[in-house]
Regions:
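N-terminal secretory signal peptides that target proteins for export/translocation
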Residues: 1-6
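N-terminal, post-signal-peptide region of Sec/Tat-exported proteins
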Residues: 57-89
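C-terminal/domain-edge helix-coil "capping" segments
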Residues: 30-39, 43, 48-49, 69, ...
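Generic recognition of short, well-ordered alpha-helical segments
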Residues: 97, 128-129
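Bacterial N-terminal signal peptides
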Residues: 10-23, 27
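Short acidic, glycine/proline-rich loop/turn micro-motifs
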Residues: 50-56
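Short, mixed-charge, low-aromatic patches
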Residues: 57-63, 117-124
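Short, solvent-exposed, polar/charged sequence segments at loop or secondary-structure edges
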Residues: 76-116
């Protein structure tokens, strides 16, 4: 099962291309600590590898939209960050030349950090989330966060979003303070 999960994430592109061998701490975040950090959050991709007999695509799309809205709302509510609207939707790139172009485009729009990710449903009650924050200027990884959450209902997705939101904001501020 673990190999299949890694294969699905690799296939999704988040463990290949730009991210292999990247530095975990970027030299970006050049804005001073008293300025809001410009961040853009692209729509995450969703992969269901659970092989459940029931098609839950509509429910998963709805939960993913709510997850993304809440994540962006959390970034907006935190005055230490400035949310720059994402210009790619749906199917935001996560690897290769398309991602390099996306980073360039985000940088030109004023984004300093681009957050991308994927949610993968492994089984009836287990899902993985991989999130990567990339400095748009240096095109280096600021951080990666991989975690598993249990459940496939609104409450489980909300808990996962709250956890990720705190992690993203804390890690961005930590990387910024290490400048």
């Amino acid at each position: 099962m673990r190999h299949a999960s890694l294969h699905a994430l690799t296939t999704a592109g988040l463990l290949t291309g730009l991210f292999l061998g990247s530095s975990l701490i970027s030299d970006a975040s050049a804005a001073t600590a008293d300025q809001a950090l410009p961040v853009s959050v692209d729509d995450f991709n969703y992969i269901d590898t659970s092989n459940e007999p029931t098609d839950q695509t509509a429910a998963h799309e709805k939960r993913l939209r709510a997850f993304m809205t809440a994540l962006r709302d959390d970034v907006t509510a935190d005055r230490r960050f400035e949310l720059v609207p994402s210009s790619c939707a749906p199917n935001c790139p996560t690897e290769g030349p398309a991602l390099v172009d996306r980073l360039r485009e985000a940088s030109q729009a004023g984004t300093q950090i681009l957050i991308i990710g994927i949610v993968q449903k492994l089984s009836t009650l287990v899902q993985n989330v991989l999130t990567v924050a990339v400095d748009t200027t240096s095109q280096r990884v600021v951080f990666k966060k991989f975690f598993t959450f249990r459940g496939d209902d609104d409450e489980a997705w909300q808990r996962a979003e709250r956890f990720l939101s705190e992690e993203v904001r804390d890690r961005l501020l930590k990387s910024r303070s290490q400048q």
